[in-house]
């Protein structure tokens, strides 16, 4: 989808971080925008900021883990603009715990946002996009943790591996139907966002009590937080996404050096050996 001008983009997690950066980049291409986020205040600020630059943009507070909330987002998008050409399933959360420390509520929260948030988006938008019959593109945000298993990120890893294989299967399903909709899966490494603070959106009694987490998980979590703080700017990721949409690129790897780790993982599998623990 090389010409984005006048096309409509829906972006979840669009109030800040990678989502906001993609929104800014899409607006610069002349796209109309529908932004969704759980944080209504930040969402309103971003919508006002973009509207101030001349962008045609609306925002809707959305809980992507809720099917009805995402369906309402789709209703609003199609009612306002008549079609959707670019769907960015981007909303995501994370927490640092080993598999045995991750509670059932933790699993439900992470999977609800990171994986079911994507499946809800696909169900709400794809049938209508197919019915319109126009050229389109879907970008699902996974992570390098969807290709490489990081320590102390049990639920996050599972959710992001899920997004990768979901996206691969989606590509096959749309190809078999000769649909005009292409797919990309975004697998960024460390990016300077607030994802390490994602638990701020949880109920207080469900947030991680770090006094009850073992020191290995705590130290690993601190290393991850530092890596995020030293990560690349979201604007670089947004540029990669726009370029991938225009060139119909499936895998979006924002950090080229991670390819070496992916190669090691493939070799581990082919050699049937234990997974190599890569540096954070």
Short names for language-model regions:
Residues 143:
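Residue(s) in the substrate-gating loop at a strand-loop-helix junction
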Residues 2-34:
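Canonical Rossmann dinucleotide-binding motif of NAD(H)/NADP(H)-dependent dehydrogenases/reductases
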Residues 176-251:
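SDR active-site lid
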Residues 29-46:
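Conserved glycine-rich Rossmann-like NAD(P)H-binding loop of the short-chain dehydrogenase/reductase
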Residues 122, 159:
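Active-site helix of classical SDR
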Residues 98-99, 103-108:
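Substrate-binding pocket helix/loop in short-chain dehydrogenase/reductase
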């Amino acid at each position: 989808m090389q010409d984005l001008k006048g096309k409509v983009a829906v972006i979840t997690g669009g109030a800040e971080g990678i989502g906001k950066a993609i929104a800014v980049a899409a607006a610069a291409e002349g796209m109309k925008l529908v932004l969704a986020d759980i944080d209504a205040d930040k969402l309103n600020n971003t919508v006002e900021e973009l509207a101030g630059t001349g962008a045609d943009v609306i925002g809707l507070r959305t809980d992507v883990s809720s099917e009805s909330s995402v369906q309402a987002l789709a209703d609003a998008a199609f009612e306002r603009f008549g079609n959707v050409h670019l769907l960015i399933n981007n909303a995501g959360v994370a927490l640092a715990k080993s598999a045995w420390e991750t509670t059932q509520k933790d699993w439900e929260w992470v999977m609800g946002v990171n994986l079911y948030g994507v499946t809800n988006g696909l169900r709400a938008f794809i049938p209508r996009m197919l019915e319109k019959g126009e050229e389109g593109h879907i970008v699902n945000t996974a992570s390098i943790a969807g290709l490489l298993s990081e320590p102390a990120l049990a639920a996050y890893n599972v959710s992001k591996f899920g997004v990768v294989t979901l996206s691969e299967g989606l590509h096959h399903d749309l190809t078999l139907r000769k649909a005009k909709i292409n797919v990309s899966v975004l697998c960024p490494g460390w990016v300077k966002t607030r994802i390490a603070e994602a638990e701020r959106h949880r109920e207080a009694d469900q947030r991680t009590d770090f006094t009850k987490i073992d020191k290995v998980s705590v130290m690993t979590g601190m290393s991850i937080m530092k890596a995020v703080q030293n990560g690349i700017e979201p604007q670089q990721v947004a540029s990669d996404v726009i370029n991938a949409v225009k060139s119909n690129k499936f895998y979006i790897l924002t950090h080229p050096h991670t390819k070496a780790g992916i190669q090691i993982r493939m070799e581990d599998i082919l050699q049937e050996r234990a997974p190599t623990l890569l540096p954070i």
